[in-house]
Amino acid sequence: MALSKIDAANFLTGTIPQGNVANASLGAVTALPAAIPTGKVLQVVTGVTYTTTTSTSATYADTSLTASITPSATSSKILIITDQFMRKDQNNTYIGYKLFRDSTELNYIGDLIAYTQNSDSDANGIGTTYLDTPSSTSSITYKTQFATLSGGTITIQADASSGNERGRGTMTLMEIAGW
């Protein structure tokens, strides 16, 4: 059996003759054909809240974090990214966290544990990333809700390290061209 040696350093060198390329150079390509979906971002909306919400209940309540967007096409998708902080007041406190489009529940994150080795207050980040297909060109409002699933007290938009009730919650909505 014959062995061949391939010089990998020079294997992929060279040029394509200009006559074989439709444009003068690949750098001159400015657009893809319409049949190729690009998934480009059409608009970005951000919602911010500093409002503190506290609960000791297993009944879900709004966190005060909302953002609204009006998609430009029914084929668009909406990428939702939320980022909030919560504080619990005792060890082994479980939290439930939900994302809604108007009144429709989209995403549920349940049994998140806010755990420390002692019963001291502890702050943790909480959030979600979700790709929605609303199939609408009407205004849409997204919001988050939370509940305490195991007793104890949960405070959203809380900063335990400074001992105050301030914190920032953000929601970013990105309309992505449909594909």
Q: Across the structure, where does each feature detected by a protein language model lie?
A:
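Glycine-rich, low-complexity segments
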Residues: 1-52, 178
